[in-house]
Regions:
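Class I SAM-dependent methyltransferase Rossmann-like catalytic core
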Residues: 1-31
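C-terminal or late-domain output modules
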Residues: 2-5, 75, 265
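Conserved phosphate-coordination/catalytic loops
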Residues: 12-20, 99, 103, 107, ...
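A short acidic, often aromatic-flanked loop/helix-cap motif at beta-alpha or helix-coil junctions
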Residues: 13, 18, 68-69, 85, ...
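Secondary-structure boundary/capping motif
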Residues: 18-22, 34-36, 65, 85-88, ...
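Conserved SAM-binding loop
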Residues: 27-136
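S-adenosyl-L-methionine-dependent methyltransferase catalytic module, highlighting the catalytic core
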Residues: 106-276
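Boundary detector for helix-to-coil junctions that initiate low-complexity/charged tails
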Residues: 245-344
Length: 344
């Protein structure tokens, strides 16, 4: 399991944090019982966040409009529409969904929320980027960078613009109408989100080396509660809805403190130092190559000089050969030969 956690932490903070947060909420709320959980739109790829010896989750069902991924084990996977789920009311102890809501069309966004509420017995957790000036600006900058370096927009970010991000007031109107008790908080402080997502885009487009970015990711994710990640404005908002009010917890019990960012300073120093080291290494390599190139240039000049000398000597030899040929053609040379000239 340690290897699995390490692998998860090497993913981008955007991906890791949202699933880690939901898993922690589930652990805190259901600490004393085993539950069945529905992951709406999870595609089954992040199910390991909800499993393990410390997790209260006993069974996991995934519903997603996409076909199941390869090599998925230990879950029930249903390919279906989350706005028209066939489950009975209150079928699952907990229903969770992260970064799916913004990929639902405006006309069915309300239905998505009401369906999640309908099939949950005790708890609903929905996390997504919601409409705000800061979030839209950050997504635009990230998408522009990706498009500049790949020639096409980022698939998921582009859908946020095409389908529109959800609006908090619409969700809260549904919750108020149903008289649901809920908590709301933000994660992925917007500056940090943009920095980390751009770094991971640089990895995807080979601007930065994969090991360097994964080292950044692992440090960030393993110190999530020390990154100031829960300060506002945040990129992602979470709604934690308690259908079973007896399970209500305070926000301070469910998520790390919003304060403190000491580890972020360490991360920035580590990352910049690593970049400086890499830059120095590249500079040293460049200087070495230039030195080799200069040596090669000098050697080339020497070769050219020798070649020139050889050419001159070849011309001299040709001239001598011509003179010898001329001598041999003269009569007296022939007579001299007949008389036995040169005999010993």
């Amino acid at each position: 399991m340690t290897d699995k956690i390490s692998e998860q932490q090497r993913t981008s903070p955007d991906a890791y944090s949202r699933h880690y947060i939901v898993a922690e909420i589930i652990r805190q709320v259901f600490s004393n019982k085993k539950i069945n959980l529905l992951d709406v739109g999870g595609a089954g790829t992040y199910v390991d966040y909800f499993r393990g010896s410390s997790s209260p989750v006993e069974t996991v069902t995934v519903i997603d409009i996409l076909p199941p991924p390869d090599k998925i084990e230990g879950i029930t996977y249903i390919q279906g529409d989350a706005t028209k789920m066939t489950f009975v009311d209150n079928q699952f102890d907990a229903v969770v969904s992260t970064d799916v809501f913004e990929h639902i069309s405006d006309k069915t966004k309300d239905k998505f929320i009401t369906e999640c509420l309908r099939v949950a017995k005790d708890l609903v957790v929905v996390g997504a980027p919601f409409e705000s000036e800061e979030v839209t600006r950050a997504e635009t900058l990230a998408n522009d960078y990706y498009k500049k370096n790949t020639g096409k927009p980022h698939l998921w970010l582009n859908e946020h613009f095409e389908l529109n991000k959800p609006k908090a007031e619409n969700v809260e109107a549904i919750l108020a109408k149903g008289k649901y008790e809920y908590l709301k908080f933000s994660s992925n402080q917007i500056d940090s989100w943009l920095q980390s997502i751009l770094l991971n885009f640089m990895k995807e487009t080979n601007v930065l080396e994969r090991p360097l970015v994964e080292q950044f990711n692992q440090f960030y994710n393993s110190h999530l509660d020390q990154m100031g990640d829960f300060k506002t404005p945040g990129y992602r908002s979470f709604y934690v809805v308690f259908k079973n009010k007896a399970l209500m917890r305070g926000l301070d019990q469910l998520i790390p403190s919003a304060g403190g960012a000491l580890a972020k300073l360490d991360l920035e120093a580590m990352f910049l130092t690593r970049l400086a080291d890499d830059r120095k290494q590249l500079t040293d390599q460049k200087n070495s190559l230039e030195e080799t190139a200069n040596q090669n240039q000098a050697l080339t000049e020497q070769i050219r000089a020798v070649a020139g000398q050889l050419k001159e000597k070849t011309e001299i030899l040709k001239e001598l050969d011509a003179e010898i040929s001329g001598l041999r053609s003269r009569r007296w040379y022939g007579l001299y030969t007949l008389l036995g000239g040169g005999r010993k």
